[in-house]
């Protein structure tokens, strides 16, 4: 009895609804194509974040008319990412539709905005909508939520997606108005469930003439469909293509956990970057610092979290930044006692130009996360701090204009692209794996290698980045941004920024510098950088190879003071000094004795007072140096000879009147020999040099950092000329013995 009694109560409003729908002749009264100005986009945004601005920019690109509801209001619709909710959107739409309910020729497109971009224009949307021959079309989804128990109530779909997605729908204004008039719930109730229950009710579905966009012709929900969609470049345009249905959806929705994929698509759509024209948004909303009277104040955060090679050069490069020093303040965290001397030298130099310098040393015993929180807060708490520029010690900023370039891009968070030399290792990730770690995006290699140049919205960046001070005092006003669960500090920062809806960008519009490797950095030597030829070859070359080395091949500066004795620059002053220091620090000079356990047979016929490279662990480095820098010179001066770049004897010789002042005539046990002067005649010693007896030719003024190269056995009998006072050092290798 109860059931039979309930039927009339349910049927009466449904009959009224059907009668109302029959009275509307929207489809018949709108012959031909609907004009673009008859489409109104409605969205809800109680705040304006980066996602909202991206949505509005894409709408502006296609000349959509957009009405934003809820601006300035408190959001009471729940946490849509982690729970049901969203009812506030329905209420706001219900209120707004009272104004449009009678406009039978008006089409309403309701969509999310924080995680949506348009890929096509109003004409395309309306054309596709009209072809459905329905009054309301909802986005379709392959996933059923929030109530999986309703699956059986959905109409069967043979091709396409079966379930409703409330993130986007389009329909004639009277039908949309009547649909949302059904809402009588609370703001924190679920909008998805509300629309679902309307759709799965056969009578209501018929009354409202609702269908789903089963093949994603208009709406593309990315959640559950990431393997269906690809980026498509064609005819100067960038589109998202659904490869399952061969469609080009117009509104792309990064619902659920797919916001990172949407950010990737948003780097290209709508025509943000194309193969023909490159980056279309790079110069939009930028700042021209040349027109600014007072330069923005920048807090430069420097972080030395592990023993780092080439640190003095890193610090000195910070002082070469093309930015007014009076607008800089420094925050330095140094975790390593090993680097305290480098910091002191740097601060003594920097304090003359930079008035505010805060140093947090190893005695504070701060974790990396605590130190980074402190550095960021140093800017956050200073109302005059316009930007926070964080730089790790493993970043080599070779472009002095880096800071200016980043400021002028005018993004909340932006990082310059830096990579390891010759590798794909960089300071950003283009995608994330399901567990939140590195995954390679389709465009990662092209961005790293500079095949695609622009400003890229990415899920992770580290090592060096710029954050606007006003962002730290608004969206990111919490102090503890570098601690989250068990994540590394850099991952915690990026996770927090993503959750706050703050976009992070990477720029590869310029060459900014590179990353160095801190792996395998052994600090047991006196001058540890000398061992970095394998890990950081570019930095090693810059520090230790003579600046004129390249002129050997471009300007033919090789000299020939004696027949087949070639003379050329090879080492920098620093290389010479550090090699001598390293040998003296080791201190176990051989004394120039004939009996020598270091060599095969234990006897040296022409002994020198020396230390072998092998004794200080430098042998492999030295042999690599020979192959990389000596071998090319060999090919130039000894045409047709290809060296193996191998030497059994590599050593530094020490000449002094007190120990060994000269060396008697001899042939070297080599195909050819190199002899590099490590200090200056006239300054460090008097006398010395080398005489080639067969040619009666002497070289008495060796140049520091320059090498002799001459044949070894048979032709070039030679002797070491006496040192009169001081100490002379040379580095020698018997190559291809």
From Swiss-Prot:
UniProt modified residues of type Phosphotyrosine: 323
N6-succinyllysine: modified positions: 704
Entry comment describing in which tissues the protein is expressed: Is highly expressed in the heart, lung, kidney, eye, ovary and placenta.
Compartment(s) where it occurs, according to its Swiss-Prot or TrEMBL record: Rough endoplasmic reticulum membrane
Keywords tagged on the record: Dioxygenase, Endoplasmic reticulum, Glycoprotein, Iron, Membrane, Metal-binding, Oxidoreductase, Phosphoprotein, Signal, Vitamin C
Signal peptide: 1-25
One term of GO molecular function: procollagen-lysine 5-dioxygenase activity
Residues annotated as domain Fe2OG dioxygenase: 644-737
Protein name per Swiss-Prot or TrEMBL: Procollagen-lysine,2-oxoglutarate 5-dioxygenase 2
Organism: Mus musculus
Gene designation: Plod2
